[in-house]
Amino acid sequence: MNQTTIAKEVKGIGIGLHKGEPISIKLEPLEAGSGIVFYRSDLGISYEAKPENVIDTQMATVIGDHRGYVSTIEHLMSAINAYGIDNVRIVLDANEAPVMDGSSIGFCMMLEEAGIKELDVAKKILVIKKSVEVKEGNKFVRLSPTDMPIINYTIEFDNPIIGKQNYCFEFSKQNYIEQIARARTFGFLKDVQALRAMNLGLGGSLENAVVIDDNRILNPEGLRFKDEFVRHKILDAIGDLTLLGCRVFGDYTSYAGSHKLNHLLTKELLKDPSAYEVVSLEKSTYKVYEKVFA
């Protein structure tokens, strides 16, 4: 099985979640071995989507350096992972990816329009060989060896609308599109107001987030899934793990995880070469792992 890129260039436009300004986005094909690269056209600077380039995880996953940064990359990265795309250049004219509708379905539609092109170099996959875990109080994220890639995610909020939710996701592109891609980011009205006081979250609205005010959902259309909150956390986790550079063949388990914990997990994993193996999917090995690309 070979690496892929997109078959043709596609363009889109959206709003930035934090600045609230229009953002142009363009996806361009790249050759094998290039990986996922973000290009700030307004600065003329490129950033590879890798754990070592992450500079902030407080509100979103942010890559960059002293010259500039690209924020809120996780939803786009999640869609790229689901479509099995190894190499693509993302051109942005601002410091964040557009929020779209708060989920990754808009990016999935862009990738559908672009199509997928197979390249002439074998695809790689990261196989988990032993468990790696990161904890913060009672919160944790863990990667473990498995025969089938599973994401088992639990969240628990002191709010009756969310409460405790668990979702077990068996990874495949079709499952992702049906179960995960449409799950939107969410937040509490009081937090939105605090963010705006700091000149952040200016692009957030009921058009691109589920907003909760005490015991009610403000979005007139309600939820897309009864457990949309935990499904979106899975969407985020997939995006964060994509910074490892290839699809992860492992069992990801989380209780109250976050962008911060996901980033620390990728760093902890890469510190221990015995915890993983990067496998080249030549014909002789592909059958063992083909389920992850179903």
Swiss-Prot record:
Catalytic activity as recorded in UniProt: a UDP-3-O-[(3R)-3-hydroxyacyl]-N-acetyl-alpha-D-glucosamine + H2O = a UDP-3-O-[(3R)-3-hydroxyacyl]-alpha-D-glucosamine + acetate
NCBIfam families the UniProt entry points to: lpxC
PANTHER family in UniProt: UDP-3-O-ACYL-N-ACETYLGLUCOSAMINE DEACETYLASE 1, MITOCHONDRIAL-RELATED
An annotated Gene Ontology molecular function: metal ion binding
A single cellular component GO annotation: membrane
Descriptive protein name: UDP-3-O-acyl-N-acetylglucosamine deacetylase
GO biological process, one term: lipid A biosynthetic process
HAMAP family, alphabetized: LpxC (MF_00388)
Cofactor: Zn(2+)
Keyword annotations of the record: Hydrolase, Lipid A biosynthesis, Lipid biosynthesis, Lipid metabolism, Metal-binding, Zinc
Positions that bind Zn(2+): H75, H232, D236
First and last residue of the signal peptide: none
Job description of the protein: Catalyzes the hydrolysis of UDP-3-O-myristoyl-N-acetylglucosamine to form UDP-3-O-myristoylglucosamine and acetate, the committed step in lipid A biosynthesis.
